[in-house]
Each structure stands twice: as structure tokens, then as C-alpha cells.
Amino acid sequence: MKVVIMGDSDTVVGFRLAGIHEAYEFDLSELSIERARNKLKELVERDDVGIILITERLAQKIGELPQVNLPIILQIPDKFGSIYGEELLREIVRRAVGIEVKR
């Protein structure tokens, strides 16, 4: 199964250099976001795609991501870092362990 990357130019180039050949670049313009939504729908329907990596900023602009078992859709930080940071980590710990971690 293939790993696919969707994101900004810098992130996509990095993953191409790491060996991911199926990569799609999108900026955050309205037209590009619509193209990204369509590409994501297309990728989710393919049988040969196992993991879709998508930058957090692009995923946020797309809105609701498909809720599917396969392919696995993973949000990754871009060159500016995570937009979720501690909040996401707290939620993951809360779900996994059943307790809320606070400072």
C-alpha cells in the first residue's frame, strides 16, 4: 500500500526527498483548497493507498476529514510547526488513559 502526502510545497518536497513519490502540493487559496478536497476524496476511494499524510493547516482549511478505517489519514505539522500542540496531546492522553492532564 502507498503512502501519499498532501500539503504545502516545502513539506511535500521534504517528503519526496524521503522517498514518498505520490505527493500533492496545495496552497491555502480557495481554489486550491477545493482541489485538495477533491483529491482527498479520490485518494480515500483508492484501494492502493494505505496512509494519507496531510498538513494540519491544509486539513483545517479542508474542514471535516473523511472518517474511514483505511486509508489512515494522519495530520502532520508543516514548516511552521503544529497548530494543535499541547491541546492535541492532552486530548490523546485523555482518550488513551482516561484522565485529563493539566498544568
From Swiss-Prot:
A single Gene Ontology CC annotation of this entry is: plasma membrane
The principal localisation class reads membrane
Question: Which GO MF term does the entry hold, naming one?
Answer: ATP binding
Classify the protein's membrane topology as the record does: Peripheral membrane protein
One record GO biological process: proton motive force-driven plasma membrane ATP synthesis
Keywords for this protein: ATP synthesis, Cell membrane, Hydrogen ion transport, Ion transport, Membrane, Transport
Compartments it resides in: Cell membrane
Quick check: keyword Ribonucleoprotein in the entry?
no
User: Any keyword Ion transport?
Assistant: yes
What role is this protein assigned? Component of the A-type ATP synthase that produces ATP from ADP in the presence of a proton gradient across the membrane.
Family in the record: Belongs to the V-ATPase F subunit family.
- Subunit structure, as described in the record: Has multiple subunits with at least A(3), B(3), C, D, E, F, H, I and proteolipid K(x).
Supply the name of the protein.
A-type ATP synthase subunit F
Q: Which source organism does the UniProt entry give?
A: Pyrococcus horikoshii (strain ATCC 700860 / DSM 12428 / JCM 9974 / NBRC 100139 / OT-3)
The organism's taxonomic lineage, starting at the top: Archaea, Methanobacteriati, Methanobacteriota, Thermococci, Thermococcales
